[in-house]
Amino acid sequence: MPKVQSSQVVLDSAYRCFCRNGFRRTTISDIVEEAQLSRPTVYKYAGTKDEAFAKVVRVRLEQAATAAGEAADAARSPEAKVLGVLTVKLEVAIRLWDDSPAHAYELLAAASAHTPDLVAAYTDHLARLLASALDEAAPDAARQAADVLLTFTRGLEDDLRDTEAARLGLRTGVRMITSGALSRPVILPA
């Protein structure tokens, strides 16, 4: 099997194992069995369980970051750009919940604990996309609004039992938050 194909098989197998067993209960033996490759081949492409997990997280976040950038580029209005970026973020969480309803919380926590730099880089990328979308209309509030929008979306990701309600909540929240960020700022007394 060619290198790229073997590497992809190993990472796809690792993802399925993490989704099925959770982070704590997945072993390299599980990944070897799922990939139907030799143990040395799995170690070559995945490394340890922690390294395999980090590689899976990296690939998933890189794909999501690319999709978020494309969504922002395709949209015409600041609100549509924001909604496009945050829809990508929410859909990543929905996919994880669909793939691993029993272990989604654990996997999200493991990603934050075991790959904090990857998660932070992804979040920063999204914040820059959001701030850029809002910057022309609201340069003073763009980064703050981006942070609020990301926090709001993380809140929606906490309970994805009803994905349509989460999607509707995202659209409603984006409309409300961006309309506030894009309106003339109100200066409150100190």
Q: What annotation goes with each model-predicted range?
A:
Residues 9, 13, 17-51, 55:
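Helix-turn-helix
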Residues 65, 111-137, 143-147:
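Amphipathic alpha-helical packing segments from all-alpha helical-bundle domains
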Residues 80-84, 92-117, 150:
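Amphipathic alpha-helical segments used for helix-helix packing
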Residues 49, 56, 60, 64, ...:
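Hydrophobic/aromatic residues within well-ordered alpha-helical segments
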Residues 55, 68-95:
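Hydrophobic alpha-helical connector segments
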Residues 1-5, 185-190:
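N-terminal intrinsically disordered/low-complexity leader segments
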